[in-house]
UniProtKB/Swiss-Prot annotation:
Disulfide bonds join C344-C379. GO terms for biological process: proteolysis. The lineage of its organism: Eukaryota, Fungi, Dikarya, Ascomycota, Pezizomycotina. It catalyses: Hydrolysis of proteins with specificity similar to that of pepsin A, prefers hydrophobic residues at P1 and P1', but does not cleave 14-Ala-|-Leu-15 in the B chain of insulin or Z-Glu-Tyr. Clots milk. Its EC number is 3.4.23.22. GO terms for molecular function: aspartic-type endopeptidase activity. Residues 106-417 form the Peptidase A1 domain. Belongs to the peptidase A1 family. It comes from Cryphonectria parasitica. CDD domains: Aspergillopepsin_like. PANTHER family: ASPERGILLOPEPSIN-1-RELATED, BETA-SITE APP-CLEAVING ENZYME, ISOFORM A-RELATED. The keyword Glycoprotein does not apply. Residues 21-89 form a propeptide. This is Endothiapepsin. Residues 1-20 form the signal peptide. The gene is EAPA.
Length: 419
């Protein structure tokens, strides 16, 4: 599921004059990746998206869209009233800060085709399509994204009769046709990968010039290509990996690292605790064993949810969320800004979630997403209610607090370790 969420970049001419405003284009960032670290083992880092600015209400709206939930009027109003330039909090006074002060500004360079065309994609464990803006995308729906041009790739082949379509909660959709082509990430190469070329793109993606497309890492049963579903990049890569795993080590105020085919034992502390995964819906769905707020007592309760790198925030049951914000003086749920806000002068408590008998602690700083607008004394919270979405989502707020193993063996599991 995931998110939709945020990112951005700068300029480059599109071949063939697909756009009338080439100054809005950007060049894909060169790969910032380590070479192959051993047979069947690959490691690469995300890179900072220098132009993205976090917008709380828009982040919540994108999550609704991603999961196909209609947008409530109050949330749409909050998005319309919001501004995109948020500043980092500074002991009560809002100050302008570099964009990397908010952990929603990282993207992953991916090479597609021969010769390689570099696009910056959102690695999304909440979806299963690899789709991109392309030379086939309606010109008016491209606004700053780098595009994939199949005709410039000698290895691109149209998958005859294949189409894809993803519908969103506001009734919009993204859709197009399908090519197979060579796709490489950090030295890990898959030939004949299904690359879904967008002919039509939802406005929520057009408005987000930071993302050139998505690389889905959920289960292939969630793929939307018809008449025959296509495998994800991970599923296609498994045969060449030393082990059928990938790991996410997302950073706080820093780029994260994805590893494929191995587990870096230096990236975490203690041991990894594994938990069962339900693949019924095609997601990395698991059940947390409970939670604690700050130094409070751990409350044992089952919280079923999805591990979703493509969603920025942590969405939990309303009772859990209200229990957290009740510990922050002045915090309140505000429909006018799309969720819980709190005084920027407040020090947020940590939030702990259970993985089996293990405990993963999210520091309070991770939950602070800065002033709701430049100069505001109210800040946007990183823990929000899942009530309107219908599913709990362990997004990046939770995942960056842990080293996470996505084990794609015959019986999939998720592993969490402190770091």
């Amino acid at each position: 599921m995931s998110s939709p969420l945020k990112n951005a970049l700068v300029t480059a001419m599109l071949a063939g004059g697909a756009l009338s405003s080439p100054t809005k284009q950007h060049v894909g960032i060169p790969v910032n990746a380590s070479p192959e670290v051993g047979p069947g083992k690959y490691s690469f880092k995300q890179v900072r998206n220098p132009n993205y600015k976090f917008n709380g209400p828009l982040s919540v709206k994108k999550t609704y869209l991603k999961y196909g939930v209609p947008i409530p009027a109050w949330l749409e109003d909050a998005v319309q009233n919001s501004t995109s330039g948020l500043a980092e909090r500074s002991t009560g006074s809002a100050t302008t800060t570099p964009i990397d002060s908010l952990d929603d500004a990282y993207i992953t360079p991916v090479q597609i085709g021969t010769p390689a065309q570099t696009l910056n994609l959102d690695f999304d464990t909440g979806s299963s399509d690899l789709w991109v803006f392309s030379s086939e995308t309606t010109a008016s729906e491209v606004d700053g994204q780098t595009i994939y041009t199949p005709s410039k790739s000698t290895t691109a082949k149209l998958l005859s009769g294949a189409t894809w379509s993803i519908s969103y909660g506001d009734g919009s959709s993204s859709s197009g046709d399908v090519y197979t082509d060579t796709v490489s990430v950090g030295g890990l190469t898959v030939t004949g990968q299904a690359v879904e070329s967008a002919k039509k793109v939802s406005s929520s993606f057009t408005e987000d010039s930071t993302i050139d497309g998505l690389l889905g890492l959920a289960f292939s049963t969630l793929n939307t290509v018809s008449p025959t579903q296509q495998k994800t990049f991970f599923d296609n890569a498994k045969a060449s990996l030393d082990s059928p795993v990938f790991t996410a080590d997302l950073g706080y105020h820093a780029p994260g690292t994805y590893n494929f085919g191995f587990i870096d034992t230096t990236a975490y502390t203690g041991s990894i605790t594994y938990t069962a995964v339900s693949t019924k819906q095609g997601f990395w769905e698991w059940t947390s064993t409970g939670y604690a707020v700050g130094s409070g007592t751990f409350k044992s309760t089952s919280i079923d949810g999805i591990a979703d790198t493509g969603t920025t925030l942590l969405y939990l049951p309303a009772t859990v969320v209200s229990a957290y914000w009740a510990q922050v003086s002045g915090a309140k749920s505000s429909s006018s800004v799309g969720g819980y806000v709190f005084p920027c002068s407040a020090t947020l408590p940590s939030f702990t979630f259970g993985v089996g008998s293990a405990r993963i602690v999210i520091p309070g700083d991770y939950i602070d997403f800065g002033p709701i607008s430049t100069g505001s004394s109210s800040c946007f919270g990183g823990i929000q209610s899942s009530a309107g979405i219908g599913i709990n989502i362990f997004g990046d707020v939770a995942l960056k607090a842990a080293f996470v193993v996505f084990n794609g063996a015959t019986t999939p599991t998720l592993g969490f370790a402190s770091k």
